[in-house]
Amino acid sequence: MKALIKRYPDYGIWMEDVPMPEVGVNDVLIKVKKAAICGTDLHMYKWDAWSQAHCKPPYTMGHEFVGEVVEIGPGVRNIKVGERVTAEGHIVCGHCRNCRRGMGHVCENTISVGIMGKDGCFAEYVTIPESNVVKLNPAIPDDFAAIMDPFGNATHTALAFPLLGEDVLITGAGLIGTMAAGICRYAGAKHVVVTDINEMRLDIAKKMGATLTVNGAKGETVEWAMQKLGIKGFDVGLEMSGAPAAFNDMIEHMYKGANIAQLGILPADTQVNWSDVIFNALTIKGITGRRMWETWYQMEQMLLGGLDLSPVITHRFKFDDFQKGFDVMVSGQCGKVLLEME
């Protein structure tokens, strides 16, 4: 079968013919229909410092997909051949302290599909443990099913705190930030302001329901947005950028007693004015992955309730044209990029 392999510890990714994956005990073999390129895939493609520290080539990349079950291994009880599925990309042990207290998303022994320890879905076929396979409601289209993984990150972050009637500041208009804007509006936020320096991505944020967008590259400021909306601060902050300046700008413009959900990965040497955090009684909550399985139930219900993710999907390429997909990701002038196997 064809697969995209991170063959060497170097810039790039390579298409190769590889053997079909073996179907082991409790495994489900899935024929991939569509896969999506993630920001993490871009890190591995570039072979940056994070990838060098966490990933060990060779391996098949990819962890966002939708497909059809074509074979089940011994022990599989609840998944049937022919079912349309996606998967939770974090394979957890189920036995560590965190798993046993209902916090599998921070399992001490996590294996990440297509990243660390398990070949991924940038291939014609992929095996996933039954415990991680997610059956899909027929009303959820393939395009949305293929991006449930990052939609889950956005959902986990956006719903970390109550939103109904609240003013929300989102720093970072990447895929997760723009989806979070839609979630916030769906959940009843009063105003949603999104900041970034990429006008194309801010346009996507507007399509997803942002009340106002702030482009720092044009000299626009959060203060300008607050003045225009007639507000003096924000109740909820969703930090998606990982940019120290954006994080500190957020802290400066929160109401006292406000809440911040932090998904963006800040540099280790980030300087923070902790006095503002302490004396303004701010709560900062770190976010990783998706809660298993509450986040998945929330995602499904929002999609069935009419939340439209189509504005975030900007490019589609055939699997053989994967290089075009990675090129547009490198350019930054895109939302979500899909690779279509069929």
Residue ranges of predicted features:
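Acidic carboxylate diad motif detector
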Residues: 263-264
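C-terminal substrate-binding/catalytic core of Rossmann-like NAD(P)-dependent dehydrogenases/reductases
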Residues: 223-227, 231, 267-315, 323-324, ...
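Mid-domain Rossmann-like dinucleotide-binding core that forms the NAD(H)/NADP(H) cofactor-binding site
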Residues: 138-218, 223
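NAD(P)H dinucleotide-binding glycine-rich loop of Rossmann-like/cofactor-binding domains
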Residues: 93-171
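N-terminal glycine-rich cofactor-binding segment
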Residues: 3-22, 39-71, 86, 107-119
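Glycine-rich beta-strand-centered segment in the early N-terminal region that forms part
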Residues: 21-35, 50-97, 137-139
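Glycine-centered, small-residue-biased loops immediately flanking beta-strands
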Residues: 258-259
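Helix-to-beta-strand junctions that scaffold the AdoMet/dcAdoMet cofactor pocket
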Residues: 254-255
